[in-house]
Design a protein with these regions (language model features):
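N-terminal lobe of the biotin/lipoate ligase/transferase fold
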Residues: 1-160, 233
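Catalytic beta-strand/loop module used to bind and position nucleotide/cofactor moieties
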Residues: 3-4, 15, 20-21, 101, ...
Length: 316
């Protein structure tokens, strides 16, 4: 029903045409209309003219996303719920059941969203992109961290293009605007030593999050696209653009390896050439961030030489 109304945009669609195309009765049509109105859609009903969509709520439901998708597989199979504890958890369950590569779990709100190192990820309703994608790359487990960097490149390129904002990458999994975090990327996997079974790639983006929804302790370190851009953004369009770019960059990674990703990552990183402190398992290391190793490790130039940093919190 919604797809038909969206086709006509501001024009009326007759009950007769709806009945014919959906092969349903006028009574069934009215039930569909009432359900859509409950979900926040404003639909005008006019005698002898039919039905017209007047207002669409900001939702990331499949019927809002699919008309904009331009991918081969990413997002073509989708699980959507209004509110979930965590899209990562649902995606893991789906992957264990055999979900195909490109399967997407997406929601309007998370009540128990998680970031890197099991930190809380605040996911207020109807204001962000909270999604998890199932991947099945034919790579060894040791190369899986490269997928976080690959996704960082794809999302950064998309957000720069679609919003005009100067989005930069902070190793290993954050995207920043003006030094504040707007996106986090979380890569989790199941596999054996020589082969990844599946990867769940989680992406959380503060899109239309307002200052009221940012916890006090995050005000100085987090922001949103709307706050920085001074306007709101259509989340379905952003999601479709991200999935298209991500699919293309991912396929390029599988075909050509990590080196092209490494070059693109270094071009988009806002931390290279700066003095940083890396909190490593061996203790804090201070030095200049100079690039990425072929493995995806961050290269830190210190007084002792250039060191690869594999897992760390970074302070700039």
């Amino acid at each position: 029903m919604l797809s038909l109304l969206l086709e006509r945009e501001d024009a009326f669609l007759s009950g007769e045409e709806i009945s014919r195309r959906l092969n349903c009765s006028r009574t069934a049509i009215w039930k569909h209309i009432k359900e859509l109105r409950k979900e926040g859609y404003q639909i005008e009903a006019r005698p002898k003219s039919g039905y017209r969509l007047v207002y669409r709520p900001d939702r990331v439901a499949p019927e809002e996303l699919k008309p904009h998708l331009r991918t081969r597989s990413f997002g073509r199979r989708m699980q959507y719920q209004e509110c979930v504890p965590s899209t990562q958890l649902l995606a893991h369950e789906w992957a264990k059941e055999g979900a195909e590569e490109g399967s997407l779990v997406i929601t309007e709100e998370q009540t128990d969203g998680k970031g890197r190192m099991n930190r809380i990820w605040h996911s207020p309703p109807h204001s962000g992109i909270w999604m998890s994608l199932v991947l099945r790359p034919p790579i060894p487990v040791t190369e899986a961290p490269q997928l976080t960097l690959m996704a960082s490149v794809a999302v950064t390129r998309t957000l720069r293009r679609e919003t005009g904002l100067d989005v930069t990458i902070k190793w290993p999994n954050d995207l920043l605007v003006g030094g504040k975090k707007i996106c986090g990327i979380l890569t989790e996997l199941r596999g054996e030593q020589d082969r990844v079974q599946y990867v769940v790639l989680g992406i959380g983006i503060n899109v239309n999050v307002t200052p009221d929804f940012l916890p006090k302790e995050l005000e100085s370190i987090a922001t949103s696209l709307a706050i920085e851009g001074g306007r709101t953004f259509q989340r379905p369009l952003l999601i479709a653009a991200i999935l298209k770019e991500l699919e293309e960059v991912y396929e390029g990674y599988l075909d050509h390896g990590f080196e092209p990703i490494r070059i693109l990552w270094e071009e988009a990183a806002g931390m290279l050439g700066r003095i940083i402190t890396a909190q490593t398992p061996e203790g804090p290391r201070r030095g200049e961030a100079v690039g990425l190793a072929s493995s995806g490790a961050l290269l830190l130039k210190t007084e002792e030489g250039t060191l690869p940093v594999y897992s760390s919190d970074i302070q700039i």
